[in-house]
């Protein structure tokens, strides 16, 4: 459980060449697509009434391959070595961009459209391998940081491609500039891909099914047939792209009609939104404690709604002028700042929302299904984006809503969709409550938690100071833990939801309720036999004076039935807090106090006697109660 910064990945060959390759791909997608749209709108000789039709055709041609070829991309990602597959896709990109370059140089719209469809196909085939290679290249504790960097790179590349297209298309020799830019970027992407280390095929024996319609349906069913946490994460991921597509497509018109701005204002808003997502994606690693922390998803969802509502509420505050505002003039208006802050906030919380979802899908999907499940995610993403376009047409055209009112509808829909997801998968809410507690009421620090094994069974033993010990431990330790706790604590209102969802084990004294007592030991043995972590509080009760009480003999029974390593833990700084039994406690007395979790070296079964364990835990805790 090493705790290195996500930025160290940029210095490692197992990540950096892939990061450069995927970022250049996202950049080139948007450089070419946006250049083509600008050419249709301002450069090519077309009937004025036809231009909007051609622009909409561009959107269709780019997204159609995700429906047609994502299933093939999923199969390819499992049958072939991922490094070789990426190189083949990037080599094809050079040919596709050569066709597009020829189209620009000759003003041949048909060639440009063929190239656009080709780039959509390139992205549809690249998507499954893009996300399924990460768990092969990264350790589990690096997965959130790696996904954060990928999302940051993707959205900044999208922004750079969009801006780059505008710069190139404004030059007199735009055709040459675009042609050289897209082909040159494709070549650089291929060269970067040659440095990606070997990523072996996970199912080389797979027989490819070339029936794209049959396979698309089968893969979509596979994705949505995963565990509820994975399948609803796929839905949540697609919902993010639904929301993002609406905001991104409306930004140009919003900047013109509601911010009364020129083209520089459009660029400013796009920049703020993209930088916000990049920032939120990067912050995920720090906020999650370098583990797959799905508790950030409800937090991100809350922010998406809050800042969407703020954006709607403050729209209309910016006054019009004789000439459109440029970006500097807009920044000088106090009325615009709430809108701009809302846009950044949307991006930041969007990053909090999407990165943990991607990481969960990767971490909890079987290796031999991962690429196909991600392909299913891409198919659903495309479907949600098409539905978002249809909904936008209906609400803005038929219902005659304004753009801010559309943002209001999206913000309210976000509440409904995520309430459904969190109801089906209460683990999201449970992890959010744990995350909120450990990041709001306390400043939780930890030492030597790398002593807890990354995999395999172990028994954790810890002193028992407060009603929230299990929540704090669960929030700090990367692996899921099954806690054994006194049944009356387990049944506490609100907390019972958290404990039950986490699979905690209620226990009573043998003389108090023998059925609960025996059932608890049976479940402990079951969890340990399955290779999970189980945590017990051997005192059997909360401390009444802050000191560590006698450890009871239940640990002997556990280890006799299922011999596993024992890891001693100690909680420091919780005594006197609101959730302890200190008579002098108060809600604000130790609010935001420093709490430390310390792990000791593993103790072999034969040495794990109650008195010896108590001595180890006492030594770890020291004098800090």
Where are these regions (language model features)?
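Transmembrane alpha-helix termini and helix-breaking/packing motifs in multi-pass membrane transporters
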Residues: 35-46, 100-106, 159-182, 257-258, ...
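Catalytic core of membrane glycerolipid acyltransferases/transacylases, capturing the structured
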Residues: 454-514
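Substrate-agnostic recognition of the 12-TM MFS/MFS-like secondary transporter fold
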Residues: 16-34, 58-96, 111-170, 186, ...
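Juxtamembrane intracellular "pre-TM" segments in multi-pass secondary transporters
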Residues: 2-16, 198-235, 258, 324-332
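Helix-loop junctions on the cytosolic side of multi-pass membrane transporters
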Residues: 132, 136-137, 182-209, 315-318, ...
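Symmetry-related core transmembrane helices of the 12-TM Major Facilitator Superfamily/SLC fold
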Residues: 176-194, 405-419
């Amino acid at each position: 459980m090493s705790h290195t910064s996500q930025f160290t990945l940029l210095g490692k060959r197992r990540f950096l060449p892939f990061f450069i390759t995927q970022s250049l791909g996202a950049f080139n997608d948007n450089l070419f697509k946006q250049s083509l749209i600008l050419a249709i709108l301002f450069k090519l000789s077309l009937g004025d009434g036809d231009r909007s039709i051609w622009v909409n055709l561009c959107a269709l041609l780019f997204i159609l391959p995700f429906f047609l070829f994502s299933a093939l991309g999923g199969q390819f990602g499992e049958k072939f070595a991922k490094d070789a597959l990426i190189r083949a896709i990037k080599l094809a990109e050079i040919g596709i961009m050569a066709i597009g370059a020829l189209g620009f140089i000759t003003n041949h719209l048909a060639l440009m459209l063929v190239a656009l469809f080709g780039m959509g196909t390139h992205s549809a085939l690249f998507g499954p391998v893009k996300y399924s290679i990460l768990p092969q290249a990264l350790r589990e504790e690096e997965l959130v940081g790696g996904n954060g960097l990928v999302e940051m790179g993707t959205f900044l590349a999208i922004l750079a491609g969009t801006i780059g297209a505008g710069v190139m298309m404004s030059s007199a020799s735009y055709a040459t500039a675009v042609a050289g830019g897209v082909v040159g970027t494709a070549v650089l992407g291929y060269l970067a891909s040659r440095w990606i280390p070997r990523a072996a095929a996970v199912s080389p024996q797979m027989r490819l099914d070339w029936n794209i319609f049959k396979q698309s349906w089968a893969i979509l069913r596979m994705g949505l047939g995963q565990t509820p946490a994975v399948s609803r994460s796929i839905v949540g991921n697609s919902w993010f792209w639904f929301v993002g597509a609406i905001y991104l497509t409306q930004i140009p018109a919003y900047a013109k009609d509601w911010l009364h701005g020129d083209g520089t204002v459009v660029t400013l808003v796009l920049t703020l939104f993209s930088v916000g997502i990049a920032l939120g994606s990067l912050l995920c690693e720090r906020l999650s404690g370098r583990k797959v922390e799905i508790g950030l998803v409800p937090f991100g969802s809350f922010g998406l709604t809050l800042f969407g509502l703020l954006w709607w509420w403050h729209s209309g505050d910016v006054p019009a002028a004789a000439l459109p505002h440029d970006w500097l003039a807009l920044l000088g208006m106090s009325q615009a700042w709430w809108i701009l802050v809302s846009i950044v906030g949307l991006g930041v919380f969007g990053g909090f929302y999407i990165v943990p979802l991607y990481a969960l899908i990767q971490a909890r999907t079987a290796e031999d299904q991962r690429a196909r499940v991600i392909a299913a995610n891409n198919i659903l993403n495309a479907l949600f984006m098409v539905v978002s376009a249809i909904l936008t047409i209906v609400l803005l055209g038929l219902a005659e809503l304004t753009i801010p009112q559309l943002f209001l509808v999206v913000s309210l829909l976000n509440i409904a969709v995520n309430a459904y997801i969190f109801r089906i998968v209460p683990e999201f809410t449970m992890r959010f409550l744990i995350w909120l507690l450990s990041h709001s009421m306390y400043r939780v620090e930890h030492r030597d938690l790398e002593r807890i094994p990354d995999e395999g069974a172990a028994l954790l033993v810890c002193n028992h100071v407060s009603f929230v010990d299990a929540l704090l431990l669960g929030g700090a330790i990367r692996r899921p833990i099954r806690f054994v706790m006194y049944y009356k604590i387990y049944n506490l209102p609100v907390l019972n939801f958290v404990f039950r969802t986490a699979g905690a084990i209620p226990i009573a004294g043998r003389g108090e309720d023998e059925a609960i007592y025996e059932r608890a030991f049976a479940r402990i043995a079951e969890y340990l036999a399955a290779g999970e972590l189980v945590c017990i509080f051997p005192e059997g009760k909360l401390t009444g004076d802050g000191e560590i009480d006698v450890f009871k003999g239940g640990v002997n029974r556990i280890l006799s039935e299922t011999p596993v390593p024992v890891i001693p833990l100690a909680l420091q700084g919780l005594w006197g807090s609101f959730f302890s039994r200190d008579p002098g406690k108060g809600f604000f007395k130790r609010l935001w106090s420093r709490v430390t979790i310390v792990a000791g070296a593993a103790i072999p079964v034969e040495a794990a006697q109650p008195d010896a364990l108590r001595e180890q835990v006492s030594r770890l805790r020291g004098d800090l109660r």
